[in-house]
Amino acid sequence: MPDNAYQIECVESAPFAENSYILWRDGRSDALVIDPGFDVESIRAILDANRLSTAAILNTHGHSDHIVGNAKMKSAYPTAPLLIGRNDAICLSDPVANLSAAYGIAITSPPADRMLDHGERVELAGFSFEVREIPGHSPGSVVFVFDEFDPPMVLGGDVIFAGSVGRTDLGGSAPQLFEGIRAHLYTLPDATILWPGHGPSTTVGQEKRTNPFVRGR
């Protein structure tokens, strides 16, 4: 039987309404922190309220609103490794690549402790999940597929949203993004829960039926 005894909390941070996630298994004292944004204080408050340490910091991609909290998280939890897709790792140190320079600021992050590749399986904090690379919004965007759950769930960053998809006009590719969504998300069960980098959660089935940018075939 699938083990669904887990908790997930979302912290939405201004100014980009970016979603950070804290994920942990019931009965454990460590958690995964995904895409720490500007509001690290609220992330830490959730960790402290649940008496959790940080097992790892995961970035779905390297855009500044999703990596800006990395430095504060690493300072607070220095033993927690930082993981990001291999093809977005350069964004951590390059304000042009992570788009913060376009806003007149220079956001940088500590370097990755581990770079992730498509198809890799990661085991952390009692979880086992698959990395799937879906470029198009950024060169190395990855999603984390927790296929051990019923229904499965995906932490998807800015690849797909409820009723929309990630921007492709900042050095991305719409055909590449749509192809990746169909190949690596729409092949999952319709009940799969999608936790995006902005906005509310949705499901694979809902997006296949109604997403105006990329319908299921």
Specify the residue positions occupied by each region the protein language model found:
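Conserved beta-strand hairpin/beta-sheet module of binuclear metal-dependent hydrolase folds
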Residues: P2-N50, V143-G157
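Active-site HxH/HxHxD metal-binding segment of metal-dependent hydrolases
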Residues: F38-E123, P152, R209-G216
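Hydrophobic residues at beta-strand termini and immediately following loops
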Residues: V11, L116, I134
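Metallo-beta-lactamase
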Residues: S29, L52-T54, V96-A101, R121, ...
